[in-house]
């Protein structure tokens, strides 16, 4: 799938959108989103272009980047602003600079990431990202560690700026064979318990019920 990252200044954003709404482009990445109104304005332009160019209305999906304190404060309304939205992420480099942080280190950004994650889950869209710097493409062990933290926290993917980062993200956010086998075994044990009339059952020494399965 092809997503085009447009520019933020409005005049440049509109020009980029004009150039990007085509059948081959399935979505846009919107940087420095500050409000739901900004999303709605750009969606009006996108809809006009889809109509003009014979595309289904809603063809073009959106991923938004939260990169400013104002955008962070409005993250819940932004996440639920349009049916076009499919994902939201914290833009760690720009956001950390706006906040006066020395570096976009994992722990310094963790609470902000989780706020964005909650907003995404509430809105039914994908939370994207990982604690740490997207610019880290030399220390791949650190990059892998950050990606694995995000996976454990419940994020659904991450962005990258260098080809060396791609296989690491694919590995981090793809269930392993052992995870798949464990999930299948859990479902089997639970289904057998339900068939026997039990509401909960032990699996690997812990109770499992509907929320867990």
What are these model-predicted stretches?
Residues 1-213:
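Expand to "…catalyze enediolate/carbanion chemistry for C-C bond making/breaking, isomerization
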């Amino acid at each position: 799938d092809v997503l085009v990252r447009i520019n933020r200044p409005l005049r440049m954003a509109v020009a980029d959108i004009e150039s990007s709404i085509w059948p081959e482009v399935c979505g846009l990445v919107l940087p420095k989103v500050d409000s739901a109104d900004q999303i709605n304005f750009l969606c009006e332009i996108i809809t006009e272009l889809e109509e003009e160019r014979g595309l289904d209305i809603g063809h073009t999906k959106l991923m938004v980047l939260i990169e400013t304190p104002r955008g962070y404060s409005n993250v819940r309304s932004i996440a639920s602003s349009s049916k076009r939205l499919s994902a939201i992420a914290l833009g760690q480099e720009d956001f950390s600079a706006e906040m006066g942080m020395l570096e976009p280190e994992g722990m310094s950004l963790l609470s902000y990431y989780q706020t964005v994650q909650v907003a995404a889950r509430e809105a039914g869209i994908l939370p994207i990202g990982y604690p740490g710097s997207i610019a880290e493409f030399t220390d791949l062990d650190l990059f892998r560690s950050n990606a694995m933290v995000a996976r454990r926290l419940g994020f659904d993917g991450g962005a990258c700026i260098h080809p060396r980062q791609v296989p690491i993200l694919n590995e981090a956010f793809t269930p392993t064979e052992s995870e798949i086998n464990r999930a299948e075994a859990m479902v089997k044990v639970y289904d057998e318990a339900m068939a026997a009339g039990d509401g909960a059952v032990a699996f690997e020494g812990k109770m499992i019920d509907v929320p867990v399965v």
